[in-house]
A protein has these predicted regions:
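Conserved GTPase G-domain signal focused on the G5
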Residues: 154
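Surface-exposed alpha-helical interface segments used for non-catalytic interactions
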Residues: 34, 73-76, 162, 190, ...
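Amphipathic alpha-helical segment in the mid-to-C-terminal domain
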Residues: 119, 157-158, 189, 236
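A conserved catalytic-core signature of glycosyltransferases
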Residues: 93, 159, 182
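Hydrophobic alpha-helix immediately C-terminal to the catalytic Tyr-X-X-X-Lys motif of short-chain
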Residues: 126, 130, 134, 164, ...
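C-terminal substrate-binding subdomain of Rossmann-fold SDR/epimerase-dehydratase oxidoreductases
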Residues: 4, 22, 166-243
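N-terminal Rossmann-like NAD(P)+-binding domain of SDR-like oxidoreductases, especially those catalyzing
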Residues: 1-150, 199-200, 234
Length: 243
């Protein structure tokens, strides 16, 4: 929802004036490689948080090119800019959808994720592979975050929590599949923000003199993956009743 994004920006701009922070907004498509590169050259960012993507599983079934353009080509342009800049840490959004058809719960970062069941999941897995490769080749410290069903104020209107809430306020019935015998790991937006904030200044480190003492399992590469979730299964009907 473009209007939702514009409203978010207006709130940030008002807060920026009040707090006297040096915050700038640039309207830029990640496919605009030259414009993106000019921003990096001029402002020389030290930290990059990439939350830009074409999201959603169902939409990807009929709109493949939008996912390739945004999540693959756009991500490539961004990480190339990081490569040619003195970036201290790149944090990027992956997704819990990369776990695909895994049936071993709870999901763990060291599980295999080689069988995505949607194009969206495949693009997010690709992001992880690309970030790992750039960390290996160019020593870019990077962290991928696999988010689990994020909800909260200003959330995406196509997500279940917002759809449920809208139907409740409109006094419309809520469509429930599988008789409600579904569970999800719902993650509140404030927890996501806190996670990113805490990780930003703590990139993965590699002890090249003594690689075995490095904090990452792939000790030659400053790249890591974290699950970001509530850590508890919530029954769908319980969630609806809480709303």
């Amino acid at each position: 929802d473009v209007n939702l994004k514009k409203s978010r920006i207006e709130i940030i701009e008002k807060s920026n004036k009040y707090l006297n922070k040096k915050w700038r907004f640039f309207k830029c498509d990640l496919l605009e490689k030259l414009k993106l590169s000019e921003i990096f050259v001029k402002y020389k960012p030290e930290y990059v948080i990439n939350l830009a993507a074409q999201a959603g599983v169902r939409y990807s079934l009929d709109n493949a090119n939008e996912y390739i353009n945004s999540n693959i080509l756009g991500f490539t342009n961004l990480i190339e800019c990081c490569r040619h800049s003195d970036i201290k840490h790149l944090i990027y959004a992956s997704s819990s959808s990369v776990y695909g058809g895994n049936i071993n719960f709870p999901f763990k970062e060291d599980q295999g994720v080689n069988h995505p069941v949607s194009l969206y999941a495949a693009t997010k897995k690709s992001n992880e592979l690309m970030a790992h490769t750039y960390s290996e080749l160019f020593k870019i410290p990077s962290t991928g975050l696999r988010f689990f069903t994020v909800y909260g104020p200003w959330g995406r209107p196509d997500m279940a929590p917002m759809i449920f809430a809208k139907n409740i306020f409109s006094q419309k019935p809520i469509k429930v599949f599988n008789n409600g015998n579904l569970t999800r790991d719902f993650t509140y937006i404030d927890d996501v923000v806190e996670t990113i904030y805490r990780l930003l200044s703590k990139p993965a480190t590699v002890n090249y003199a003594n690689p075995m003492q490095s904090e990452v399992s792939d000790f030659a590469c400053p790249h890591r993956i974290f699950n970001v979730g509530n850590g508890k299964e919530v029954n769908l009907l319980d969630f609806i009743n809480t709303l």
